[in-house]
Amino acid sequence: MAKRIPMLKARDVMRVLRAVGFAAKRQSGSHIFFQHPDGRTTLVPRHGGEDIGRGLLRQILREAEITPEEFSENL
């Protein structure tokens, strides 16, 4: 059975994205746009100290083309 994706703070998600090669390109309000050198992109909301829900985290992983296993390894 697959492990559930945890609810995390935005800073943890951004740390993993940087670890797999993404860089913050710009920010609009509380949303940070990340881009990988190969062209993949995703957007991470940063709203105070709130957790990023599982559904949104799944969407970020899908956009970034990162598997949940790869994400967990870089946590």
Regions found by a protein language model. Give the residues of each.
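Basic nucleic-acid-binding interfaces
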Residues: 1-75
